[in-house]
């Protein structure tokens, strides 16, 4: 089977909620990332575009195809949109890996995109008409993104609270993790660590002034001195706060994946190779610890041990997620 490599990797800056990037749709942001990744790779065509998105309501048909067109790709290139919640972009990369590994594709654009700022409100039961009484308005972001589908109205952050309680992660420990993460982000911005992976975005601010955005928005606006005093976000006496949870954000990211044989034949850059991937599922309310078992499954498939890996990148949806993963010495 084919060896799969990463040819290029580009993302937009990450915008805050109703912040610098709220004038762009998710497909706009995805298109920018795809365009940047293709330019970085030095190509003008791929076999297919695969993009993940969670909040698709109001986006119009086939958001991935819209992103493909926004990137200037030809209309003969297929595009696939998928939704796997927070793992949507990663799943797009996994599917792309499988297609190339099996020889079904030679080169693909894969990634994820989201504009939480533009998530619409929904009007249930309006299709048949509201005959009498008050109607109801539902927040698409909450209903389809931040709330549990099996316990309607229950925010996913309450499951983070359950995790903190089970593993005795204190408020102080979570805040310390959040502060360290913020410190790392600001340090990376200052030293321009992410400069080569961020595609600058041209926009016009609310005062009509043209701006070029090159930095992630939220770390710059954070006020670390206030973090210890923030109120819990999900339970009155809880430990999970807005600071030790992830931000509501906008952005897009894309990879160009190809087979090693194709990359070498076409003289394309090879930045890394992908060996394999794994998925793991358990009860939805236990999502905070699912990465532990996905990692163990992955290591077993490679006959590796955790100490053979130099760097782990873990989704920080809540501080308790990487903190839980550290329990297996990662």
What are the roles of these predicted feature ranges?
Residues 12-38, 55-57, 80-94, 106, ...:
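Active-site pocket-shaping loop/turn-to-helix segments
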Residues 1-59, 63-71, 78, 162-171, ...:
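Conserved active-site "lid/cap" helical segment
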Residues 328-330:
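Conserved small/polar residues in nucleotide/adenosyl-binding loops
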Residues 82-114, 164-193, 254-261, 326:
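Active-site-proximal alpha-helical scaffold in enzymes
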Residues 107-162:
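Flexible glycine-/small-residue-enriched beta->alpha junction loops
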């Amino acid at each position: 089977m084919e060896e799969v490599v990463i040819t290029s990797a580009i993302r937009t800056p990450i915008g805050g909620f109703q912040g610098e990037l709220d004038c762009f749709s998710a497909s706009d942001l995805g298109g920018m990332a795809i365009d940047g990744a293709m330019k970085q790779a030095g190509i003008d065509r791929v076999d297919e575009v695969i993009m993940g998105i969670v909040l698709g309501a109001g986006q119009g048909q086939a958001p991935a195809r819209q992103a493909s067109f926004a990137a200037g790709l030809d209309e003969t290139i297929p595009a696939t949109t998928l939704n796997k919640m927070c793992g949507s972009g990663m799943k797009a990369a996994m599917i792309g890996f499988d297609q190339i590994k099996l020889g079904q594709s030679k080169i693909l654009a894969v990634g994820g995109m989201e504009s939480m700022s533009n998530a619409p409100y929904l009007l249930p039961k309006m299709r048949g008409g509201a005959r009498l009484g008050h109607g109801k308005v539902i927040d698409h972001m909450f209903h389809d993104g931040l709330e549990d589908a099996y316990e309607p109205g229950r925010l996913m952050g309450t499951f983070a609270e359950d995790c903190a309680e089970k593993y005795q992660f204190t408020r102080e420990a979570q805040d310390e993790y959040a502060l360290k993460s913020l410190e790392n982000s600001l340090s990376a911005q200052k030293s321009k660590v992410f400069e080569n992976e961020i595609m600058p975005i041209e926009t016009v601010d609310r005062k009509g002034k043209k701006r070029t955005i090159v930095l992630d928005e939220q770390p710059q606006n954070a006020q670390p001195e206030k973090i210890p005093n923030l109120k819990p976000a999900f339970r009155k006496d809880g430990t999970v706060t807005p600071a030790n949870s992830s931000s509501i954000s906008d952005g897009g990211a894309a990879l160009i994946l190809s087979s090693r044989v194709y990359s070498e034949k076409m003289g394309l850059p090879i930045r890394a190779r992908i060996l394999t991937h794994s998925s793991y599922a358990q009860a939805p309310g236990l999502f905070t610890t699912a990465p532990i078992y996905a990692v163990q499954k992955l290591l077993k498939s490679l006959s590796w041990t955790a100490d053979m890996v130099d760097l782990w990148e873990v989704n920080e949806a809540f501080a308790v997620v990487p903190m839980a993963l550290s329990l297996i010495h990662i």
